[in-house]
């Protein structure tokens, strides 16, 4: 017996392609423009999900790579675009990507920095790259430095702080930054507004 068959119809071909072709959703461009689009991309049922998150001033989110943490950060920055914010991360690629995404959306009120660059810049020479490599920065030095920065005329008066990849930064300033810079008053983390992501 021969099982040879002639050309497939267009409908049959589309059915075959649908069954065997991988479904890959490219998310690298983060082309979502609005909160509903972002929630749709995240497979959220409705806008209430992110809205309820934004009502809490202190949010910590765990999620592996590709779970939408950067998209949530972008939506958060977009929602609070009239306020001054600080986005900190560990790696240079993520910082560059976030700068690009925010610039493309004309979201100019959020400073994007690597934590190392940020702390070296505000330290006035008290810490260096080697201090980060050796993990030799004391909590007391960080607190003194951050409080000095917060009381200086150069402090941008951040309304919120986002820290991405916090698991890489817990021993080099993430807690001190949240405690010293995210609070409106002197009660630190208890009264600050922040969004923290970790894997």
Write out the residue ranges for each language-model feature.
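The feature marks helicase ATPase cores and/or their adjacent C-terminal helical subdomains
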Residues: 1-199
